[in-house]
Structures are given as structure tokens and as C-alpha cells.
Amino acid sequence: TIIDWSKPARELHNLVRGLTPTPGAATIIKGKRIKIQETRVDNDNNGSNYLTGEITAIKKSIVAVQTGKGFLLIHRVQLEGKKTMDIGSFMNGFTLDIGDRFGN
């Protein structure tokens, strides 16, 4: 199932929980397909300056993504053909920047 970033963060969080581990909730970033494996919700609605699917913050253990309502905080992902890993380990081999958009 492909993630529709225009949906509210709570709905996307529940989608990820319901589809993990299989079949998985997937998205595209920089031409690569990844499954989102673990998330949290931040209902702060002050993200109107961001596009849906846009990375708004990057920290060692999370990547925050603007959704249709609130932010989805990504903790664990699985790059196609690889093992599930925490977002920090993922970023050791895959560069993400604020402003990058999931779904593209």
C-alpha cells in the first residue's frame, strides 16, 4: 500500500501499524521505495508552510514529515531488499535533507 501524505498523521500512523510487517506501507523518496515500519504522531498544526510529504525536521532518531494534518514522525524504515532499521542507521547510508519530499 502506497502512503497518501495528504491524509492526517493519525490515519497514516494507524495505516503503518495495521500493515506492518506485511504487506507494509510504502513510499518513494529520491527514486527509492521504502516501507515505513514505525511512527508516532505529532498533531502540531503549525506546518502550513510545508507541502504534504515534505521532511520538516531531521534528528538522530526521527524524521518529521508534513501530512494533511499534523506531522508523522518516522522511527523505523525498510529500504527495498534490505532489513528493517532505525531511521538513524538508514540515514548513515541514505542522505535525507529537510525539504525532501516523500511520494516523489
Residue ranges and their predicted role:
Residues 5-104:
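An anion-binding loop in the catalytic cleft
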Residues 1-3:
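Flexible, acidic loop-helix segments that line cofactor/substrate-binding pockets
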